[in-house]
Amino acid sequence: MDYHLRVLFSVSLIFVFVSVSVCGDEDVLIRQVVDETEPKVLSSEDHFTLFKKKFGKVYGSIEEHYYRFSVFKANLLRAMRHQKMDPSARHGVTQFSDLTRSEFRRKHLGVKGGFKLPKDANQAPILPTQNLPEEFDWRDRGAVTPVKNQGSCGSCWSFSTTGALEGAHFLATGKLVSLSEQQLVDCDHECDPEEEGSCDSGCNGGLMNSAFEYTLKTGGLMREKDYPYTGTDGGSCKLDRSKIVASVSNFSVVSINEDQIAANLIKNGPLAVAINAAYMQTYIGGVSCPYICSRRLNHGVLLVGYGSAGFSQARLKEKPYWIIKNSWGESWGENGFYKICKGRNICGVDSLVSTVAATTS
């Protein structure tokens, strides 16, 4: 029996795929690196048990257990393919490894709608780009709240919206306040002017620009602690206007130009961004720079910075990257963050970028 091992190391536990050939049939195992000197090779069933324990997975029946096990094995194969297509990142087992692609899209993504601007949106003015720094990160400047978790609710758009307004409010007032996604989930039903019937609809998806339009019309957002997140929709709107703490003065869409995106990021704070999340289901860390990735947008995230030292296997050189704040909790990715290559609009990351300004009072 021949074992072909490919080991990927990270600071914490990571997962490495091992392809084993037995009588001409290929099976997929995973090596879990617990100790670099004493690695233990586990069968996929044993690893599924560890996966359930690590992420607190409980299934209601033996049938559900075996169904999820089959999905888990399929996702191991998918993660292997992602590793080959995206070698500068690390792909493997995540909390989403027992979900089908359709379940993942429905429960953890949620951007929908077209690209026509709401009536109160503008095209962002062209900014000078001659002296942009090589690296920039709003996390080091106090404009980014801790990573949040949308749960099994397609409300990513609301987290992207609040993240951008949290940063803008910080720039306007010097105060970092965590804002309420649940207010958007419950109260925002603004519609995309390009696509009839495509409206912000809680856990069933929405669009950041529509949410900015709602926030502008409503007067602003409450604190998260005053209107806490539940990860469910269908409830009544509990907006208390006397508790609004952050308001939008204007918002605009940035052109598909990475220097302009960087300039707007530096001047205006974290930016609301849409992306294709195909590679994010299996992402563990590193700089994601896939050879091929659709630009069909399906996930709302927050652009908080960029770096200059991510190695790209495709380009065989250091490649600059965007730093993305996600809304799947700190156990996903690099403590809740995602790095993706700059330079080619990979996964559509440059296609729909919005900046918002907050009022000073």
From Swiss-Prot:
Disulphides: 153-203, 187-237, 293-347
EC top class named in words: hydrolase
GO molecular function, one term: cysteine-type peptidase activity
Residue positions with a glycan: 250
EC number from the UniProt entry: 3.4.22.-
Active site: 156, 299, 326
Keyword tags: Disulfide bond, Glycoprotein, Hydrolase, Protease, Signal, Thiol protease, Vacuole, Zymogen
Induction, per UniProt: By wilting and abscisic acid (ABA). Induced by drought stress.
Protein localization: Lytic vacuole
Residue ranges annotated as propeptide in the record: 25-131
Main localization, broad class: other
Signal peptide per UniProt: 1-24
Entry's Gene Ontology BP terms: proteolysis
Pfam family, one: Inhibitor_I29
GO terms for cellular component: lytic vacuole
Superkingdom of the source species: Eukaryota
Keyword Signal (UniProt): yes
Keyword presence, Glycoprotein: yes
Family: Belongs to the peptidase C1 family.
Role, per record: Probable thiol protease.
Protein name in the entry: Probable cysteine protease RD19B
Organism, as annotated: Arabidopsis thaliana (Mouse-ear cress)
Gene name per UniProt: RD19B
